[in-house]
């Protein structure tokens, strides 16, 4: 009546249809899904695929589900052939799990209705927005650089034309 289970799963079970969707529907409708944690790829020997931890609970006090993206570089250490979860990484993930706080790009608690509206999809990426790591470009600065480069090219073309004229002269 007060049990909790943590199950290591491959990501596909969290979004595929068919029997897997029916199982997710049962777990969500009965308020058993406490947390879904996505981990970095290449953590387990023999597979480079990323895995998730599905935490089920029989004693939840609300109908929200927590989603945690622990796949970023802050949550593992790169070693020769594998990625490794250190004690520090595990403590950080557990702290996020325990507090159930929303952390931008890392953790978010989602209401039951939102999961139902999303066809019982339990993929972390559906609810936790990935951090935008693209370079921010100042368009005005870029236009200045292009203008300078074009001017240099024009100057070089003029110099080349003058050299060719002297050679052919």
What is each model feature region?
Residues 1-169:
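A conserved structural/catalytic subdomain of Rossmann-like adenosyl-cofactor enzymes
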